[in-house]
Amino acid sequence: SEILSRLRENDDLKDIPIHFAIYKQSSEDSITPGEFITQATAEKSQTKLNEWHNINEKSALLPSSTAADYDENLNNNFKQFNDNLQSYFSNFTQAVGKVKFVDKKPQRLVVDLPIDYYGQAETIGITQYVTEQANKYFDKIDNYEIRIKDGNQPRALISKTKDDKEPQVHIYSN
């Protein structure tokens, strides 16, 4: 309430809602981001916060036991996605997925897919195949992004939001 009182002293912040959230930062060596754990709001002109509400949010790597605890089907689909890519492309290593669960449902998936770049034609072929696999395995996820990269160099981006009927595909020029 000390922070809220100080904010309310500012004329620009006197008559607007102010929202607070507590964020738990991940460990320094973690690949997944931290997460919001609770939130509260002070309505217009209020000097006290409403009740705090827990935020049921969790980030996990795919595949992993944490992801399987939240959505075993998604975890298995990601394994199959990787297996199919390894079967189709002899020089493919493995994709890394990060998923954000909200209320135990996958809300956002980000996949980093490393490739060895052999030319634009191969990038197009890989991107087409990955798009087919994404449609097959990630169709039930509202938002996903698959970043195809050669080292740090982006080669293609496949993304889909809940409003998209089909994934959006962008192949970067050399």
Question: What do these predicted ranges mean?
Answer:
Residues 1-12, 121-142:
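Short, non-transmembrane amphipathic alpha-helical segments
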Residues 89-115:
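Short edge beta-strands and adjacent turn/loop segments
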Residues 66-73, 77, 103, 115-122, ...:
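Extracytoplasmic/periplasmic, Sec-exported soluble proteins
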Residues 30-34, 123, 157-158:
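A short acidic (Asp/Glu
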Residues 1-55, 164-174:
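Terminal low-complexity, intrinsically disordered regions
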Residues 44-89:
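Charged, low-complexity helical/coil segments in non-catalytic cytosolic or luminal regions
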Residues 120, 141, 153-174:
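Hydrophobic, glycine-enriched assembly/anchoring segments
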